[in-house]
């Protein structure tokens, strides 16, 4: 008896909460569900399109900037809390 979550064809979705930092514009919608198999680069590209800016700094939990090749599910499993992965973004460097 297989459940949907154990099926290889099902992809776990991760809630990504995007939070503006510094003078960055606030998005109208701040929470998104994306497939966990996606790379973090997809989140970065999405933010660049939404903000119409190439200058973008992203941080997980206001602490560190992950490698764009990291999978979203790995970041969520290690740094997510309250059922979501918090990603802070800024147009200029916010944290060293």
Curated annotation (Swiss-Prot):
The record's keywords, sorted A to Z, are: Acetylation, Autophagy, Cytoplasm, Isopeptide bond, Protein transport, Transport, Ubl conjugation pathway
**Which residues constitute the cross-link Glycyl lysine isopeptide (Gly-Lys) (interchain with K-128 in ATG5)?**
96
Q: Which InterPro entries match?
A: Atg12, Ubiquitin-like_domsf
Q: Give residues where N-acetylalanine occurs.
A: 2
Which GO biological process annotations does it have? Answer: autophagosome assembly; autophagy; protein transport
Return any one Pfam family short name.
APG12
Has keyword Transport? yes
Question: Where found in the cell?
Answer: Cytoplasm
Q: In which tissues is it expressed?
A: Ubiquitous.
- Asked whether the keyword Phosphoprotein is assigned, the reply is no
Q: Which domain of life does the protein's organism represent?
A: Eukaryota
GO CC, alphabetical: cytoplasm
> What does the similarity note say?
Belongs to the ATG12 family.
What does the UniProt record say this protein does?
Ubiquitin-like protein involved in cytoplasm to vacuole transport (Cvt) and autophagy vesicles formation. Conjugation with ATG5 through a ubiquitin-like conjugating system involving also ATG7 as an E1-like activating enzyme and ATG10 as an E2-like conjugating enzyme, is essential for its function. ATG12/ATG5 conjugate has an essential role in plant nutrient recycling.
Record-linked PANTHER family = AUTOPHAGY PROTEIN 12, UBIQUITIN-LIKE PROTEIN ATG12
Please identify the protein, giving its name as recorded.
Ubiquitin-like protein ATG12A
Q: Which organism is it from?
A: Arabidopsis thaliana (Mouse-ear cress)
Q: What is the lineage of its organism?
A: Eukaryota, Viridiplantae, Streptophyta, Embryophyta, Tracheophyta
């Amino acid at each position: 008896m297989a459940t949907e979550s154990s099926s290889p064809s099902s992809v776990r979705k991760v809630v990504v909460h995007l939070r503006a930092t510094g003078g960055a514009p606030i998005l109208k919608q701040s929470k998104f569900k994306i497939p966990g198999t996606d790379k973090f680069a997809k989140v970065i590209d999405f933010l660049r399109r939404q903000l119409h800016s190439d200058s973008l700094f992203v941080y997980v939990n206001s602490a560190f900037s992950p490698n764009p090749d990291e999978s979203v599910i790995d970041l969520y499993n290690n740094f997510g809390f309250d059922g979501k992965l918090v990603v802070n973004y800024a147009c200029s460097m916010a944290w060293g």
